[in-house]
Regions:
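Glycine-rich phosphate/pyrophosphate-handling loop used in enzymes and phosphotransfer proteins
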Residues: 1-224
Length: 224
């Protein structure tokens, strides 16, 4: 099997049991060498956005909290570096649905630790669904029980990666509930997204769910 990122041939690691039951070892879409190049976020982090920081909350998050936005306590697994950008380029923008397997187990394990009563993926617009064919976040969460209770108000939107930081911060509420008047009283919700950039998207989603009675909300992103 060829690694989707570097093009090298992958050699699966066989166990004695594999030989006896004629079972071919499972291989992910990318090789071990490429997986090792993703940078895990470790050490002191901002408890609000998940970035590596000696100060918590970091200066950026202090602005959000001072402005009255509720805390989201984001947990980010990896740095959004060159390796991660290459992965997203192929996964999100070049139809790489098969690459969803790379981070499925890691995200599932993190969500087990978070232990929310509901897991809510950030939705995509109808236009994006038609173009891409899948929601990149929901695809990662195939091994989890998810609650797709948020939807996009508009059927189309400007691509987030093309917006300036100022434009991201000024976006209006893009989400609403799939079911009007849904009662989320008592629910401890974890919102999952792909990348934490400014935090605007996660805070929009969080506000929408709090307005419907959610008791506690935290967030998890693959990258920061």
């Amino acid at each position: 099997m060829t690694c989707e990122l570097c093009g090298r041939i992958q050699q699966g690691e066989w166990t004695l049991g594999d030989f006896f039951i004629f079972h071919q070892p499972q291989m992910l879409s990318i090789c071990e060498a490429c997986r090792q190049q993703f940078t895990r976020i470790t050490g002191p982090v901002c408890a609000e956005c998940g970035c590596q920081s000696q100060i918590s909350p970091c200066a950026e998050c202090e602005i959000w909290l001072t402005a009255g936005y509720p805390a989201i306590h984001n947990q980010a697994l990896f740095a959004y570096d060159e390796q991660m950008q290459q992965y997203f380029k192929q996964y999100k923008f070049q139809g790489g649905y098969h690459l969803r397997d790379v981070f499925q187990d890691m995200l599932a394990q993190r969500l087990v630790k978070v232990a929310p009563t509901m897991i809510v993926p950030i939705p995509i617009t109808t236009e994006t669904q038609n173009q891409r064919g899948f929601n990149q976040v929901s695809a990662w969460l195939e091994k989890c029980e998810i609650n797709e209770i948020l939807t996009c108000i508009s059927n189309s939107k400007a691509v987030q990666s093309m917006k300036t930081r100022r434009e991201r911060l000024q976006t209006t509420q893009p989400f609403c509930l799939v079911t009007e008047n849904l009662d989320l009283t008592g629910q401890r919700i974890c919102i999952v997204d792909d990348v934490y950039t400014t935090g605007r998207t996660l805070r929009h989603a969080s506000s929408c769910l709090y307005e419907s009675g959610a008791t506690q909300i935290c967030t998890v992103t693959l990258a920061r």
